[in-house]
């Protein structure tokens, strides 16, 4: 039975470690524009990072506060919102991240 089961990947750790790992991977992704990680972590990160980009495209104050709450870094959020204001993701309605297999 499916009582009290949360959706999403566990990634072999407890919930707090998974949350911290997604947060640090998202920060690294937005700082460096690309990261190298496992495929499973990349798939989990995609669902964490793409709403932040959608909020940045909206550009209003509520979206900015949501992004700060999710990432915890005001300067990084300001950079993301500046990129979105310059039209970095203007031509896409979703699917901002791409997972490429190496090796």
Enumerate the predicted regions with their spans.
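Basic, ligand-binding patches in group-transfer machinery
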Residues: 21
